[in-house]
């Protein structure tokens, strides 16, 4: 590629028709001239050959991806990150790259979108073996082609009649191994204690020892009994993650028998499959995060979790569970917040999804989570924090509600626990408050090279 060729892959962002492009932010490590590497990067993911032999045509103005910003983060790295790449004595340059990609190249189709922005041309571009997609921005014209969430945050709140606090979920545990009868009794107890939503674990499938039909039937009956006893709506969230050709059938069977929300693991099942199901769905859909960490965890390679969050929202998920705060989940606070923001921020006609940061939560982690997010528009999803409570799941759920009441009343957890044995038992079992707040492991804030806002994934 000559210097004159490079120019066709660079543009002033202000001069472009923003409705015709997606804007993509990448972290890139390259050898040699970073401008040449950036030009190759755009060429490979769009018009790798922009004219026919013997022709003076130029396909780049309409079809070429363009570099609109190139920032050098480190111009003299001794080698590529993670020991990737070899065979060149040229210094390695770390860059932040912003690209405008014409969405007419692939249209409003998620498999084709991912093939362009995360495909062969992106991750096998000459001289640039280290790549991480950090963010993606969609124009209104592109978003208008998608349904997005059917219910969204407002619709879910309306179904539950919960408008001024977080929505309280619980993962029924033991999550694997129980028959439907015992499993449904645990769910019933948790609803009586104050949970809004009792859910299947993401690994609980349609098995011979706990078949979906029987599970949905018994949990549906238990849900209705709990609604009659408490006077408030409840949701049973059934996991229908399965082969794509079974999704519609499993949706119908689960909903007919009593499930009033459905869990589908986004990446194992596929975003396009979820988008298909969204067109058929009668109830809210919830995403879980299996198979995302292998793409997202490395700081300088893969795809940022914020991008996965935006794609799940686009596909039609009403609720998106994501790795939450605390060291077990290997996410910085900033990255969790970035994902929550991606659920709630304006996105054209696409409704907001409810963010649910999860991982080892109990009554004592509710206050820190609420303060870090700065909004009541989130879901709180303990597992053992409810179902491993020493007084049982009804008391475990009650301890969550009592922790929220302490926040609203301006009390410490200790003060509230003096009047509530359920909360006192939770503190004794799971941890102790510190400095007037619930104990919660705090990952250190790190400004990462590729994405100070997103942190180390």
Swiss-Prot record:
Region of interest (Disordered), ranges: 426-457
Pfam families tied to this protein: RuBisCO_large
UniProt cross-references to Gene3D superfamilies, sorted A to Z: Ribulose bisphosphate carboxylase, large subunit, C-terminal domain, RuBisCO large subunit, N-terminal domain
Entry keyword Endoplasmic reticulum: no
GO biological process: carbon fixation
Cofactor: Mg(2+)
Residues bearing the modification N6-carboxylysine: 199
Cofactor note: Binds 1 Mg(2+) ion per subunit.
Keyword terms, alphabetized: Magnesium, Metal-binding
Source organism, top-level taxon: Bacteria
InterPro entries found in the cross-reference section: RuBisCO, RuBisCO_lsu_C, RuBisCO_lsu_C_sf, RuBisCO_lsu_N_sf
Gene Ontology MF terms in the entry: magnesium ion binding; ribulose-bisphosphate carboxylase activity
Binding site for Mg(2+): 199, 201-202
Family that this chain belongs to: Belongs to the RuBisCO large chain family. Type IV subfamily.
PANTHER family listed in its UniProt record: RIBULOSE BISPHOSPHATE CARBOXYLASE, RIBULOSE BISPHOSPHATE CARBOXYLASE LARGE CHAIN
Role description: May be involved in sulfur metabolism and oxidative stress response. Does not show RuBisCO activity.
Protein name as catalogued: Ribulose bisphosphate carboxylase-like protein
Origin species: Allochromatium vinosum (strain ATCC 17899 / DSM 180 / NBRC 103801 / NCIMB 10441 / D)
Classification lineage: Bacteria, Pseudomonadati, Pseudomonadota, Gammaproteobacteria, Chromatiales
